[in-house]
Each structure stands twice: as structure tokens, then as C-alpha cells.
A protein has these predicted regions:
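Sliding clamp-binding short linear motifs
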Residues: 1-211
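Single-stranded nucleic-acid-binding OB-fold domains
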Residues: 78, 94-95, 175-271
Length: 271
């Protein structure tokens, strides 16, 4: 979160992972810093390297169908592909994430992963199909059957929550974006400033970093991202609360007395 915040503070865009552009780790591009494939939960370095190797050997992936046909299913299995979709790694192909998840849904009898696995097994056993004898994927019937993008995307909240699930942070957007101005007005400092300090003008010129004094009371504004309810030895409820703003996050322990007073405010979500 702090890395992303620092880049954005310096005017450097942080871009979602992309199967056609990402490296294994963060990569500098003309447009900004591209999130690495290995940083996606459930993908890992080995799978990322296999994807990059196929991209370099066969060129950019045209569609999700093209991807599952070309990348070994033992490397990029259903779980990996679902994580890539949630992370936005196929967004550049022009298909909504919702539609692509339907393409790979195991409950979809026409899901493309089962079809690709069968084709790869047939090739490995020397059983080539009629179409395979006449050319590559583009002429095989697999690519021809790809439907057009339907334009039906998940709602913003679901899309972002799944993105954070696999990336650990929000990259393409943030749930608090519509409230950014109001939050800045309501708070004294952001979590990033609390953690690393903030810039102030130097009387002799330029800026210097000013740290926030220990023990200083201040106002903070953001959202509760998770609450873990605990019970003390005396049986009193308390909470471990994860707070988050657009620049950072922090874990706060809410002891029984305060928890009893604030419990009703510690649940809910920003749409």
C-alpha cells in the first residue's frame, strides 16, 4: 500500500497486472509501474515465468481463449486463471471480468478450461484433431467460437473487493475514491503521513519531512475493512479492527469499554 501510495504521490501511475505486459515483479513502462504477475495471490513465480515464456515465444495473448489454449494447463490451472481475471490481468483483451469468469466457471458445461485441457492431453498422447492438422489455434475452431464482449461487468464494489482479494491492495481504483476530498478535509493526517511523516516548507527553501509527535491526538478518516471479535479472559467482548484509507492501513485494538460503546459503528461497508 505504501509503495503504491508513494508512486501516486510522485505522479507515477500504478497499473494493474497484464498478461501481455507484466514481468514477474513490478515493471517500469511508459505508462507507469506495472504490477507483476508473481505478486498475484495464487499465481507465483513459476507460473508467471511460464506465462511470460509463452508470450515471448508466441506473441501477445489475443483473448482468454487464446491464453488457455497456449499456456500449459498444469501451470495455469483454473484457480490460477480465476486469480488472473480477478486481478485484471486480462482486461487489455477487452472482455469484462464477469464474462471471463463465466468462460472458466466449472459449472458452465462449455467452460473453456476443460476443453483446453482435453486438447492438450490429446496432443500429448499423439491424438490430433481434424482442425489441428490444418493449422494453429486461430484456424482450429477454438478461436472462431469466441463470443464478442457482452459489456456486462460486475458492480464496482465486487470488482474492487475481488481485486484486493488477489492483490492485497486496490490498484485500478479504490472504494473511497468518491469520498477522497471529504476524507482529506475531515482528517488531520493520512495513515501514510502517520507512518512516515509529512512534508512541510523549509524556511531556507525546499521541503523537509516532519514526523508526527508520539502521543498526539488526531482525527483520522477512512473505512473499516475488517473486524475480528475477541473475548477477554473475563468474557468481555473486544475487537481487532483493520482500518484503511487510500494511502495505508493500520490494525487497531479496541478494548472492551470502547468496544461496547463503538460496536455499532464497526460494521458496514462503503459502496
Amino acid at each position: 500500500v505504501h509503495y503504491v501510495s508513494a508512486c501516486r504521490h510522485d505522479g507515477i501511475p500504478v497499473l494493474s497486472p497484464d498478461v501481455n505486459e507484466s514481468g514477474t515483479e513490478f515493471t517500469a513502462t511508459k505508462e507507469g509501474v506495472r504490477f507483476g504477475l508473481a505478486g498475484i495471490r495464487g499465481v507465483g513465480t513459476g507460473v508467471a515465468q511460464a506465462i511470460i515464456a509463452e508470450r515471448e515465444a508466441g506473441g501477445p495473448f489475443k483473448t482468454l481463449h487464446d491464453f488457455v489454449e497456449r499456456v500449459d494447463s498444469s501451470q495455469a490451472n483454473r484457480r490460477v486463471i480465476e486469480s488472473l481475471i480477478k486481478a485484471g490481468a486480462f482486461d487489455s483483451t477487452g472482455y469484462p471480468r464477469r464474462q471471463m469468469m463465466h468462460f472458466v466457471d466449472k459449472n458452465n458445461p462449455e467452460n473453456i478450461i476443460d476443453a483446453a485441457v482435453k486438447r492438450q492431453k490429446d496432443r500429448a498422447s499423439g491424438q490430433t484433431s481434424f482442425f489441428d492438422m490444418f493449422g494453429d489455434v486461430e484456424g482450429s475452431g477454438f478461436e472462431v467460437s469466441v463470443p464478442d464482449p457482452d459489456g456486462q461487468e460486475w458492480d464496482r464494489h465486487l470488482k474492487l473487493s475481488q481485486e484486493k482479494e488477489v492483490l492485497g491492495i486496490y490498484v485500478s481504483d479504490h472504494p473511497l475514491r468518491p469520498f477522497e476530498y471529504a476524507l482529506a478535509k475531515a482528517r488531520d493526517f493520512s495513515f501514510s503521513q502517520i507512518d512516515t511523516g509529512y512534508e512541510v516548507q523549509n524556511p531556507t527553501g525546499g521541503t523537509i519531512n516532519q514526523e508526527i509527535p508520539e502521543g498526539k491526538a488526531l482525527w483520522w478518516a477512512g473505512m473499516v475493512s475488517s473486524v475480528s471479535k475477541r473475548v477477554t479472559k473475563n468474557g468481555d467482548p473486544m475487537g481487532i479492527v483493520q482500518l484503511e484509507d487510500m494511502e495505508g492501513e493500520a490494525t487497531v485494538v479496541v478494548f472492551p469499554k470502547t468496544y461496547k460503546e463503538a460496536e455499532g459503528y464497526l460494521y458496514g461497508e462503503v459502496d
